[in-house]
């Protein structure tokens, strides 16, 4: 199988990846004595919970204590931890669900919608709580009723990724209005046929060589007191990741992690203390970062990698 075919298959698997969700209204926001019905959905890993708020508002409206609440007042939590709605669902799941990631040495690999043996240790669907009051403004960015905030944050992230890749960010700035609209429509509709042509333009700018690769690392962060430790705090780490290292050798996940987090990744070849998890799977340290960017990056062009401690 050619490298192009491998890339295409990986891209397809990642695009079709999803997480079954069971979303329930918080008891303090529910007007009935018993819990309201749960909202069940198979939601794309690449997408954003913020894109669900209007459907959830309509579904739970009959059960709300204050039915005239605005959709922008809704927010999600998991086991008491507010979930950042501008993080892709897959990243949130990898960070907080507690599910064991799939390892390349395991066989057979799970399908995009079927949990692996490791996932079975964490009950599915992933059970989230929807709130309509007490919005945690110190932890979450405020939403708006027209999805303008999530649109703006997404486009800003796309521009950041483009700036790192090209050094200018002009590829995004020079997109036509039609292309920019199509990119966002592809995100909202989760439509690969709309997304791929624009994504290929961003990844392959004419006459420009890639300079750096957009990678963000997310680490569990222990607070200074018990209260902080219980809030699922995460530290985001970012550094310039070159396309090549040494004598024009491709940058690998192992060399990048050894550069950015040498304490957790003292070896470039073997995971000793922590693992890099992307789309629910442990990333081999020998994997090329550029190839991952081209095949399995999130919709904004970034590799959002969860760092999971071993043992």
Swiss-Prot record:
Compartment(s): Preautophagosomal structure membrane
Chief site of localization: membrane
A Gene Ontology biological process term: piecemeal microautophagy of the nucleus
Cross-linked sites for Glycyl lysine isopeptide (Lys-Gly) (interchain with G-Cter in ATG12): 159
Mode of membrane association: Peripheral membrane protein
Gene3D superfamilies, per database record: 3.10.20.620, Autophagy protein Apg5, helix rich domain, Phosphatidylinositol 3-kinase Catalytic Subunit, Chain A, domain 1
Coiled coil start-end: none
Post-translational modification: Conjugated to ATG12; which is essential for autophagy.
UniProt keyword terms in alphabetical order: Autophagy, Isopeptide bond, Membrane, Protein transport, Transport, Ubl conjugation
Pfam family, one: ATG5_UblA
Disulfide bridge positions per record: none
A cellular-component GO term for this protein: phagophore
Region (Disordered): 102-122
Highest rank taxon of the organism: Eukaryota
Quaternary structure and interacting proteins, as annotated: Conjugated with ATG12.
Function: Involved in cytoplasm to vacuole transport (Cvt) and autophagic vesicle formation. Autophagy is essential for maintenance of amino acid levels and protein synthesis under nitrogen starvation. Required for selective autophagic degradation of the nucleus (nucleophagy). Also required for mitophagy, which eliminates defective or superfluous mitochondria in order to fulfill cellular energy requirements and prevent excess ROS production.
Family: Belongs to the ATG5 family.
Protein name as it appears in the record: Autophagy protein 5
Species name: Phaeosphaeria nodorum (strain SN15 / ATCC MYA-4574 / FGSC 10173)
